[in-house]
Regions:
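N-terminal [4Fe-4S]-dependent radical SAM core
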Residues: 1-33, 48-57, 72-78
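Short boundary/loop segments of OB/S1/cold-shock single-stranded nucleic-acid-binding domains
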Residues: 252-277, 307-309
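Conserved C-terminal portion of the radical SAM core fold
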Residues: 163-228, 238-258
């Protein structure tokens, strides 16, 4: 069982992929209040869940601190057409104050949309209703199979109940103000027959008011993610060719564009540290994955992930070299 580490307000929320806030230069700000997940999906790109063999720590951020820092980014980017996307490297539904978080974000001037990604495995009607009243505008629901046996296999979780998830879909569509985007991961050779079923179900249930109702995702292999035995990622050409076939067959939009979600470029927070730059840091906690540590820059303006750091104790001060800095997600190694 991974340890749960609470991120104090002395630890910047910009810099670490596992928690906090991510700005990728658009009007979307990713919000990551917690890293835990109840499922251990066999294709998970972030190796989440209780069966993870590479995670050593899970993180949780106090919701007041998260909202305070989020508002600063909104002010920097411009108080208009901002989307707060609660996505995490786990499942946001595990965050104890998810309703309070949605409510607080919805009250920030300039925030137009609050969306959330979830498998819905622990969602219930009471929580869905509360999220709707709090201001949640869209749920991106990861639904990868309708066949119960295959759904359990993909989730690698025997208690996962896809029929319950489908019932929740119906409730969301019929009884809440939340738009539903169904977002299956298509794993070639594994759930090929399930994707058309999911398309039919979504066409029947969902009439999204403001967004597309389907967003089929391409299975990819990630450095730290789980690899599905026997599954090989398609080329992007083959993937989009098949989406167009399904579009014609089911008369539904499947090839999506950022504009479909109102996504546009917006000024990005400066990246203060360049690749290969030497930086002084202080180790403040355990890292997300094994052999990592969580560190903060000497200036206190960014968090970073310190790799190859299993022997470095918490509290240590040292020089490190930045090896990655895209979108202010900083990875460094000891010098």
């Amino acid at each position: 069982m991974e340890k749960l580490f609470e991120v104090s307000n002395s630890i910047p929320l910009m810099g670490c992929i596992a928690f906090g806030l991510i700005d990728r230069g658009t009007n979307i700000i990713q919000v990551r209040p917690i890293s835990t997940c109840p499922l251990s999906c066999i294709f998970c790109s972030t190796n989440a869940g209780p069966k993870s063999k590479i995670r050593q720590t899970e993180y949780i951020v106090p919701h007041e601190y998260l909202v305070e820092e989020f508002e600063k980014i909104v002010a920097f980017k411009g108080r208009r057409h901002i989307e707060a996307h609660i996505d995490t490297v786990g499942d946001p539904i595990t965050y104890p104050k998810i309703v309070e978080l949605v409510s607080s974000l919805s009250q920030i001037d300039g925030v137009e949309t609050i969306s959330m990604q979830t498998h819905g495995s622990t969602l219930n009607i009471k929580l869905v209703n509360a999220l709707s009243e709090a201001g949640l505008k869209r749920i991106n629901l990861s639904l990868d199979a309708l066949d119960s046996t295959l759904a359990k296999k993909l989730a690698d979780t025997e208690w996962y109940d896809v029929e319950k998830v489908v019932e929740l879909m119906q409730h969301i569509v019929l009884n809440t103000k939340i738009d539903l985007l169904v977002a299956p991961v298509w794993i070639p050779g594994i759930n090929d027959e399930e994707i058309p079923k999911i398309i039919r179900l979504t066409n029947k249930l969902c009439k999204a008011k403001n967004f597309p109702s389907l967003g089929i995702q391409k299975y990819e292999i990630h450095k730290h993610g789980r690899k599905v035995r026997g599954a090989k990622p398609l080329s992007w050409k083959k993937f989009y060719d098949q989406l167009r076939i399904w579009e014609n067959l089911f008369k539904v939009k499947l090839v999506l564009d950022p504009k479909d979600f109102g996504i546009h470029k917006r000024v990005m927070l400066p990246i203060p540290y360049g690749n290969h730059e030497t930086v002084r840091v202080r180790v403040v906690g355990p890292g997300w994955l094994k052999r990592e540590k969580l560190a903060v820059t000497a200036k206190g303006d960014r968090s970073l992930t310190l790799i190859n750091a299993e022997e470095i104790p918490v509290g240590a001060k040292l020089k490190v070299r930045i090896v990655a800095n895209k979108h202010n997600l900083l990875i460094a190694e000891p010098i």
